[in-house]
């Protein structure tokens, strides 16, 4: 983003990383009919917990911490699925201003699903083309469903138990979007304010 540049509309930048137990890679490639091998080290990271049979949440935390330090990123709000971060909640809370364990029920997520859907429709969701294939597969393989109580949920297009669609990256994107949504509602510091503060600190014009 160029200092002082004006943009006609906001954009939500999405970057996703998928995690998979190392020993399940071959079976996932065969079962999903998707060549995950092509994305190792970029869109996909392998976990070696329990000898490569389980997801290593501490490895995920370390990745989040490392990119924060490498790129000097300031985490304002982190939103997470409680089930997926059990054991590292306090660590995540320590590296951001606001840490939210997001209830994953349709009632709790419905308003955010509607809001994220509108951002997609308005063309406000941006990501690096050719570098988010796993994310794209999740988006094109999912559908927004309204249940009998009127609440929305994100579901696979196919509800068969043996289908090869994984929508986890989109579920994670929704949690990330909630953080952005809440930050905007709170009117926290924006990018222009942060840039101005940085310029003042270092004597810029």
Placement of each model-derived feature along the sequence:
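RNase H-like, metal-dependent nuclease domains and their acidic two-metal-ion catalytic environment used
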Residues: 1-104, 110, 114, 137-205
């Amino acid at each position: 983003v160029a200092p002082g540049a004006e943009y006609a509309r906001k954009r939500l930048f999405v970057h996703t990383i998928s995690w998979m137990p190392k020993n399940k890679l071959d079976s996932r490639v065969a079962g999903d009919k998707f060549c995950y091998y092509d994305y190792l080290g970029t869109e996909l990271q392998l976990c070696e917990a329990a000898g490569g049979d389980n997801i290593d949440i501490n490895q995920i935390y370390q990745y989040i911490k490392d990119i924060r330090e490498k790129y000097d990123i300031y985490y304002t709000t982190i939103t997470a699925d409680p089930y997926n971060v059990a054991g590292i909640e306090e660590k995540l809370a320590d590296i951001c201003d606001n840490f939210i364990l997001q209830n994953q029920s349709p009632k709790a997520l419905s308003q955010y699903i509607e809001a994220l859907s509108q951002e997609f429709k308005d063309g406000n969701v941006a990501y690096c083309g050719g570098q988010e294939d796993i994310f794209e597969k999740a988006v094109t393989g999912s559908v927004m469903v309204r249940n009998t109580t009127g609440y929305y949920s994100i579901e696979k297009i196919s509800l068969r138990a043996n289908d090869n669609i994984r929508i986890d990256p989109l579920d994670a994107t929704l949690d990330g979007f909630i953080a952005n949504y809440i930050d905007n509602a709170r009117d926290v510091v924006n990018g222009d304010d942060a840039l101005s503060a940085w310029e003042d600190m270092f004597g810029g014009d």
